[in-house]
Amino acid sequence: MDRLNGTPRLMIVSDLDSTMVDHDDPQNLSLLRFNALWEAYYRPDSLLVFSTGRSPDSYQLLRAEKPLLTPDITVMSVGTEIAYGESMVPDVGWEQLLNQRWDRGVVVEETSKFPDLLPQSEIDQRPHKVSFYVEKVKALKIIDVLSERLEKRGLDVKIIYSSGIALDVLPKGAGKGQALAYLLKKFAFDGTLPANTLVCGDSGNDAELLSIPQVYGVMVSNAQEELLEWYSENMRNNSNIIHATERCAAGIIQGIGSFCLGPNVSPRDIGDFQKCKVDIISPGYEVVKFYLFYERWRCADIPKSTHHMQNLKSVFHSYCTLVHPSGTEQHIYQCVDEMEKLHGDWQGRQFQVWVDRVSSAQIGSDLWLVKCAKWESHGEEKYCCLTTILMSSKAELPNDFIWLHVHQTWLDGCGVKQPDTWSASKYINLNTFNSIFAATAADSLNENVAATFFISVLSSGAVLQNKLEPISLWQIDIPF
């Protein structure tokens, strides 16, 4: 959360399974649409919160399976655990609040007396969450009796039934809604309350999110009967809650548009960027657009044309070079030439590219340092490069950006593990310094600005080397 300098423009709080993630969409099309929209327009000044019933381990399994963005805050285990940032730092204060009138041992003891309660897997059992499966016809009676018994034992608990099968026993002060209320209270105390908050869900355990005052809410089109019944009984007259006509992440995008919370046309919905004018152009938008073009080129979703390649080269400065994660350094025009030969090499097969954690900082009058995690998915395989880009805005067209240099390193554990040419040597050729200094000098930029770029790259673990051995990009097969 510290990455934002002021009040968040928008905070999206979304459930994962069957809300952000559509398990009936093997190509993850709606999720990738949301990803592109968020990274292009919202990441710099907004907050993304995932609120899930999954435990931390189960959440990580989903991240390994699906192209999920990195959220600013993760609320897990039905609102009993809150973690911040990429490193998922736990909120100890929240844990201490939940300890009041809670004894997990007593809960386990009392629930063991109900043979119809089938314990969920060990991965889903947490310090403040005891979870079971139970048939819907038996659930209501069990909830009434169990609540009474636990109250007699001196506990103050909440029992949530969702998805027509899952029963969770939590501390009274827990739950997705209470976790969100706690976060909003913290933001208000710090003077950083988001200008708008949009909550999104599909099942019974998301009802609490929609109950929070002064938030907008979206029930995705595939919302379960239990949530729709709750809405009909409690929130039908609340104009700040809609039942979307689109499934999952597409329904979230629909909610953004319905409540006029900001841009709601994903870059993935734009067929021809040259013919489409957008109101917000930023370094982050340029990165999203570039890698979307790269995906479409490899999949032959756009026709092969020298015109496309000429336009692509116009994005790069004549001095621009790319350092591949293998350590290979190439002039960017060579990379474009190699890319031209790869047109349609993934046609008819699943090949997807998306970016995560896009950030940009202005380090000169017209110079930006852009960082992102660039992911590629080839069927069951996923690779990720941490990418650092130096960009300059065109003086005559300040909303257009020129790429001066690109440096990539493998994200630990997410590189290619097969040929030796893929080894993540993380080198910077000293000649690269000369190229960037020449480019910055030609553009009347301070050498300190170029130095800032290299300090940033070196901080990611790159190593200076006098000479890099050339490796054919045909061996590497990924020019960008």
Residue locations for each model-derived region?
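Short, aromatic/basic amphipathic alpha-helical patches
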Residues: 62-65, 144-147, 227-235
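Residue-level recognition of beta-strand termini and adjacent short loop/turns
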Residues: 163, 234-236, 364
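Active-site phosphate-binding/coordination module
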Residues: 29-124, 222
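Conserved acidic, metal-coordinating active-site core of Asp-based
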Residues: 107-213
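Short helix-terminating capping/connector loops at secondary-structure junctions
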Residues: 5-7, 42-45, 68-69, 123-124, ...
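Mg2+-dependent phosphoryl-transfer enzymes with acidic/Ser/Thr/Gly-rich catalytic loops
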Residues: 2-11, 170, 177-279
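Asp-based phosphoryl-transfer active-site loop
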Residues: 8-25
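A beta-strand edge to alpha-helix "cap/lid" segment located at domain peripheries
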Residues: 276-299, 306, 321-440, 453, ...
